């Protein structure tokens, strides 16, 4: 099995252009013949998109997937936080609403959510097909 390669894009804060840079890289690599898929383990976004299975993911991840000629899927964005107010967010796990929590309560679940925050070598994202 050919080993996949990963690239991580990091920024200094919110709204600094990470999503746009990743979308551009997805398009460039896809046009060069590589199969690319975005993966953002956790995202905070007010608006979301519903994929072909009826599951939610962030619109930014959708733009990145489409830039790479991939079908947007919720497993590309396993944890989505949708703010309800200044104090709490709806927590969406694998595309489904799980619960609403403030920051303290969300972090109390962090051990349960940790498995979602990385890709292992057999993750479905690495092997899915159109």
What role is predicted for each listed range?
Residues 1-130:
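Flexible phosphate-sensing "switch/lid" loops adjacent to ATP/NTP-binding sites
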